[in-house]
Amino acid sequence: MRLKPFALTALALVAAAGFGREGNAETLFESGAKWSYYRGNDHPSGGDLEWAEPDFDDSDWPSGDTPIRYGDGNGGTVLADMRNTYSTVFFRRTFNVAKAAQVSALDLLVNYDDGFMVWINGEPVLDVGGSADLSHDSFASVGHESGNFETFALANPSQYLVDGENLIAVMGFNINLTSSDFMMDAELRSYRPDKSPPKVASIDPPPG
């Protein structure tokens, strides 16, 4: 009987957790979803970040389906009064998470023009071409054209997600008042580790 040392035996183990996130993805809200929004003719909370907190009262804000936009894109909610009038728009919506401590990763997919910043439950989580000055009349730090969704990984979700209802807030920036377009549309996906045991797909060399 010929012995095969273990070092010469390769086991091909197939585990979803080892081959990317897709097996455990959950969409927390989809693109095209409804958001509350506030036109940046003035600041919604007097210049501070209270507007990005979960307990802020946005009941008098209008709401509309995304994309919220003008110039580019189709459908959604059109801001026909934005050009030459205001350069920022403030957005809020809620989403639900069960067993938040188990969420290992978050991806935010955004189709945008020109820049934006994101808070979840009042915590800053992403800045893409936003302004260091968060006043209502600030501008994007760099121009960006919409057209495709881009994926942004949000780090350390366990530090700001809670069980049940969560609040995401977005501040959108245009590059200048005379810009020909503006857009914001987003989708949020969560990921959890795969706890199922790995399966043996093949043994090389085969036994015998």
Predicted regions and their residues:
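Bacterial N-terminal signal peptides
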Residues: 9-16
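An acidic-aromatic loop/edge-strand motif
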Residues: 131, 141-197
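Bacterial Sec-dependent signal peptides at the C-terminal "C-region" and cleavage site
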Residues: 16-26
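Extended carbohydrate-recognition surfaces in non-catalytic/accessory domains of CAZymes
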Residues: 24-103, 134-153
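Aromatic-lined ligand-binding clefts that engage carbohydrates, nucleic acids, or primary amines
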Residues: 35, 61, 95, 101-122, ...
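Proline-centered linker/hinge motifs at extracellular inter-domain junctions
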Residues: 198-199, 206
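Short hydrophobic beta-strand segments in globular cytosolic domains
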Residues: 125-126
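N-terminal secretory signal peptides that target proteins for export/translocation
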Residues: 1-6
